[in-house]
Amino acid sequence: MAKLQAAGAQIYVCAKNAAGGLNWTFREPVAALLEEGKTVGRHFVGPTWEFVDGSRVEGEVVTKAPGKTAKDIPWLKLSVKESPKSGLVAGATSILRIDTKGGVFEGACDNEGELHSEPYAATYVFVK
């Protein structure tokens, strides 16, 4: 149906854990969605994909598989909560996140509330 490249960042926040210490916690993705080098939408918290044609989908994670390396975020299969009636991904029932590169961050977390942006890239496949 649609196979799009994503280029962006995984955003982490330095937050208290259950033991009272600080650690980096995933907050949200922020990415441009590209088709043949042209920006056709954006990906953000939800997870949500919004397109320049006005259509929008939200997904829910069904399954995960490890990325190719420890630095790569997992590959995902997501179900579409409600498929748009028109637009680039009209009729989509599921979304695959594959070919991930980067996005995993680990490091010292000293200032509660501090944000860190970790670059990532992925391919999103929207399936009918």
Identify what each model region corresponds to.
Residues M1-Y12, A18-K128:
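Primary mode marks residue(s) on the alpha4-beta5-alpha5 output face of response regulator receiver
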